[in-house]
From Swiss-Prot:
<dbReference type="Pfam" id="PF02033">
    <property type="entry name" value="RBFA"/>
</dbReference>
<protein>
    <recommendedName>
        <fullName>Ribosome-binding factor A</fullName>
    </recommendedName>
</protein>
<comment type="similarity">
    <text>Belongs to the RbfA family.</text>
</comment>
<comment type="function">
    <text>One of several proteins that assist in the late maturation steps of the functional core of the 30S ribosomal subunit. Associates with free 30S ribosomal subunits (but not with 30S subunits that are part of 70S ribosomes or polysomes). Required for efficient processing of 16S rRNA. May interact with the 5'-terminal helix region of 16S rRNA.</text>
</comment>
<keyword id="KW-0963">Cytoplasm</keyword>
<dbReference type="InterPro" id="IPR000238">
    <property type="entry name" value="RbfA"/>
</dbReference>
<dbReference type="GO" id="GO:0043024">
    <property type="term" value="F:ribosomal small subunit binding"/>
</dbReference>
<dbReference type="GO" id="GO:0030490">
    <property type="term" value="P:maturation of SSU-rRNA"/>
</dbReference>
<dbReference type="InterPro" id="IPR015946">
    <property type="entry name" value="KH_dom-like_a/b"/>
</dbReference>
<dbReference type="InterPro" id="IPR023799">
    <property type="entry name" value="RbfA_dom_sf"/>
</dbReference>
<dbReference type="InterPro" id="IPR020053">
    <property type="entry name" value="Ribosome-bd_factorA_CS"/>
</dbReference>
<dbReference type="GO" id="GO:0005829">
    <property type="term" value="C:cytosol"/>
</dbReference>
<comment type="subunit">
    <text>Monomer. Binds 30S ribosomal subunits, but not 50S ribosomal subunits or 70S ribosomes.</text>
</comment>
<keyword id="KW-0690">Ribosome biogenesis</keyword>
Length: 120
């Protein structure tokens, strides 16, 4: 029987759940009090780094999004410390946050397609 997921994929899924819970319940910074969705986690093969892709409910202002990503990256050591307590890993990866704008791009494409169908 072959494995469907390798270890880094399983750890990425678990990190996604734990980081979403930490952001929602443990971060008390009022500057990021908005709905934050952890959309994807990519873990390096040696599990030393994790890239966390997040999207925000209010993501229309690019400067606000950059500030929120900066705040999350500054809080990454605190989030990593909480992850060390909640996960049984020998090495908890360093965390780097990135903005995931795929939902906005998909929404823009669907609006363009909708306008094209209305013109026909």
């Amino acid at each position: 029987m072959e494995k469907l997921f390798n270890r880094s994929d399983r750890i990425a899924q678990e990190l996604q759940k734990k980081i979403a819970a930490i952001i929602q319940h443990s971060l008390k910074d009022p500057r990021i009090k908005t709905i934050i969705t952890v959309s994807e986690v990519q873990v390096s093969k040696d599990l030393s780094y994790a890239q966390i892709f997040v999207s925000f409910l209010e993501s229309d202002n690019n400067e606000k999004v950059k500030k929120k990503i900066t705040i999350l990256n500054r809080a990454s050591s605190y989030i990593r410390k909480l992850l060390c307590k909640r996960m049984k890993l020998r090495i908890v990866p360093n965390i780097i946050f990135h903005h995931d704008d795929s939902f906005l791009k998909g929404n823009k494409i669907s609006c363009i397609l909708e306008n094209l169908t209305k013109k026909e």
